[in-house]
């Protein structure tokens, strides 16, 4: 895994955890949870690609991995929409910077997951 991406995840999660958005902390906590799950999924998918010997065991063990992959792309799209929504509403520069970076990270992670998944197909 790219250590910069991992650091970016940790940085964004830390900053989000310090925020109090006007909407609700439940929404923000949900986003944080999804970011954490997305990071774990991306890391595990990348590790499977690195250990190509595990490719067949991954496919045999988890016949629904394509469904999971589709679900992760849906989660990414939802997170992107939420980040954009927050960006249109906030005037706080700290929040703007955090969510712009989160948006950029989501696009990078989406690209990484697509690359990993093509290697697994």
Curated annotation (Swiss-Prot):
Subcellular location: Virion; Host nucleus
InterPro entries reported in the protein's UniProt record: Flu_NS2 (IPR000968)
Keywords for the protein's UniProt record, in alphabetical order: Host nucleus, Host-virus interaction, Transport, Virion
GO cellular component: host cell nucleus; virion component
Motif (Nuclear export signal): 12-21, 85-94
Keyword Transport among UniProt keywords: yes
Pfam families with a match to the protein in the record: Flu_NS2
Keyword Transport: yes
GO terms of biological process kind: exit of virus from host cell nucleus through nuclear pore
Function: Mediates the nuclear export of encapsidated genomic RNAs (ribonucleoproteins, RNPs). Acts as an adapter between viral RNPs complexes and the nuclear export machinery of the cell. Possesses no intrinsic RNA-binding activity, but includes a C-terminal M1-binding domain. This domain is believed to allow recognition of RNPs bound to the protein M1.
HAMAP family documented for this protein: INFV_NEP (MF_04067)
Family: Belongs to the influenza viruses NEP family.
Subunit structure: Interacts with protein M1. May interact with host nucleoporin RAB/HRB and exportin XPO1/CRM1.
Official protein name in the record: Nuclear export protein
Species in which this protein is naturally found: Influenza A virus (strain A/Equine/Jillin/1/1989 H3N8)
